[in-house]
């Protein structure tokens, strides 16, 4: 008869446990490696996405930067022209008379409020919120609604024409 306390039985039991632990360890290593690799790729994706969202656009770059390259110089000159253009635009206060023409800004789709400062485009006479049209003019040279050209020369001539002939209608360029 086999003695229940024979040395063979306790010796086989720990080997079976060791084998199962070894197999579990071997199978868990690739799984853990895959999870870590997936997390690293996900963090890399999140970092790239956050940096692309927080990176400033060319119109927000500081003009007085001392380490500008030659590729930034045209945008700086363009930025100066845009600032000069926005200073030349006619600012009006919203009233009932303007409310019959336009009641909301087509840039932000927000409604105009009474006595709110708005910008009137020189040729087409469309009106927009002050901040909305300034943001628009940083990247465009046209009216957001009808796409008529807005330039410094057309703004000056429009102001001169208004002073010479206040009753004459303005025509938009084709």
Curated annotation (Swiss-Prot):
SUPFAM superfamilies assigned to the protein according to its UniProt record, in alphabetical order: RING/U-box (SSF57850)
Matches recorded under Gene3D superfamilies: Zinc/RING finger domain, C3HC4 (zinc finger)
Presence of keyword Chloroplast: no
Annotated transmembrane regions: none
Superkingdom classification of source: Eukaryota
Keywords: Metal-binding, Transferase, Ubl conjugation pathway, Zinc, Zinc-finger
One term of GO molecular function: zinc ion binding
Zinc fingers classed as RING-type: ranges: 105-147
Gene Ontology terms: biological process: protein ubiquitination
Xref: PROSITE patterns: ZF_RING_2
Keyword Zinc found: yes
EC number from the UniProt entry: 2.3.2.27
A Pfam entry, by short name: zf-RING_2
Organ and tissue specificity: Expressed in stems, flowers, cauline leaves and roots.
Catalytic activity field: S-ubiquitinyl-[E2 ubiquitin-conjugating enzyme]-L-cysteine + [acceptor protein]-L-lysine = [E2 ubiquitin-conjugating enzyme]-L-cysteine + N(6)-ubiquitinyl-[acceptor protein]-L-lysine
PANTHER family membership: E3 UBIQUITIN-PROTEIN LIGASE RHA4A-RELATED (PTHR46913:SF23), RING-H2 FINGER PROTEIN ATL16 (PTHR46913)
UniProt-recorded name of the protein: Probable E3 ubiquitin-protein ligase RHA4A
